[in-house]
Amino acid sequence: MELWLTGIVLKPRGLKGEVKVKPVTDYPEKFLSRKSYWVGGSPGDAVPLAVKHASLAGGFAWLFLEGVDSREKAEALAGRQLFIEASEAEPRKDDRAWLHELEGMKVLGAGRKEVGVLKEVLSMPAHEVYEIISGGRSVLVPAIEEFVEEISLEGRYIHVPRFDEFL
């Protein structure tokens, strides 16, 4: 079974186990109807938890999960990730990509010369950031149009013409 990231638990709210979740999806409204998630530090250690109640406010999902009935249990989930089974995902929009599809892509710099490989997409408050391995070290590049000119799922590359500015 393949699991896909859909949210990140940020922190508890209140004393009864409610958690604040940052959606990592183009479909945050699905948090209102989903009955369960796989919860863990990675897909490999995720366990299923049923949703008792869900709401959306301020760009975040607020969830009560089965078995999480105290602030202490909710605090233990902070930093954990919420996954769904790939078979349950909405169809991808033509002009979009799933985050896991980007990992492992070649990164092309000026002159379309290969400069590295995308290791991970990091979710930051303002926008995503690409962690690129180049010359044996990590380079962080904001995933915004100003720096990322093209993403080709078919060609498996990301074009960052100004990559050298981040070295």
Swiss-Prot record:
- Record domain PRC barrel: where: 94-166
List the InterPro entries: PRC_barrel-like_sf (IPR011033), PRC_RimM (IPR056792), RimM (IPR011961), RimM_N (IPR002676), RimM_N_sf (IPR036976), Transl_B-barrel_sf (IPR009000)
SUPFAM superfamilies in UniProt: PRC-barrel domain, Translation proteins
User: Record's superkingdom?
Assistant: Bacteria
Q: Where in the cell is it found?
A: Cytoplasm
Which GO MF term does the entry hold, naming one? ribosome binding
Its assembly, as annotated, is: Binds ribosomal protein uS19.
Function noted in UniProt: An accessory protein needed during the final step in the assembly of 30S ribosomal subunit, possibly for assembly of the head region. Essential for efficient processing of 16S rRNA. May be needed both before and after RbfA during the maturation of 16S rRNA. It has affinity for free ribosomal 30S subunits but not for 70S ribosomes.
Know the name of this protein? Ribosome maturation factor RimM
* Organism of this sequence: Chlorobium luteolum (strain DSM 273 / BCRC 81028 / 2530) (Pelodictyon luteolum)
Encoding gene per record: rimM
